[in-house]
Amino acid sequence: VLPVAAQSVIDTDNAGLTANEVIITVKGQKVPVYRAQPQGKTNLPVILVISEIFGVHEHIADVARRFAKQGYLALAPDLFVRQGDPGAYGTVAELMKEVVSKAPDPQVMDDLDACVAWARDNGGNIDRLGITGFCWGGRIVWLYSAHNPQVKAGVAWYGRLVGNKTPLAPVQPIDIAATLKTP
């Protein structure tokens, strides 16, 4: 007998999809990106799927596959690749201190720009670009929507609007909220 939560876990299959890791090089750094898209299709709308602090794990990959099943080219980049493996830390406090707080916002924006360029060159239609993210990734949704005017829609799942400004995270979503043009 499984706990109720385990009984309701969604596990989207790969049938009809190309779903695998691709490597995108950003300023000399190889960034792993989980890609899911309908097999043999091009001119696909593009959705960037941004993880919470735990990185690209099975749930994030599953979300990408769900979007692919709906006809999207979904990309979930490992935005912490330079800082370390989020799964290697025993507590959230350690993870925040050693990995998340060390990921500079400009680096994250560059990585996402590179994902968009890769999508454009690999069957994606970036005139139909969206972004969604969870918790830490929700914050990134706000920032990237302000950064890239090509974003047509953004959905932040419980992303923080306010936070401590640091040299690596100098702007918070509340600072740019009034200027956003993206729904």
Where are these regions (language model features)?
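Serine-hydrolase catalytic machinery in alpha/beta-hydrolase-like enzymes
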Residues: 21-124, 169-173
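Gly/Ala-rich beta-loop-alpha elbow adjacent to hydrolase catalytic centers
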Residues: 133-137, 141
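Short beta-strand immediately N-terminal to the catalytic nucleophile in serine-hydrolase-like folds
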Residues: 131-133, 157
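An N-terminal hydrophobic leader/cap segment in hydrolases
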Residues: 1-25, 34
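Conserved hydrolase catalytic core segment
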Residues: 143-153
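Proline-centered loop/turn at the N-terminus of a beta-strand
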Residues: 73, 128-130, 153, 183
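The feature captures the conserved acid-bearing segment of alpha/beta-hydrolase catalytic domains
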Residues: 153, 159-183
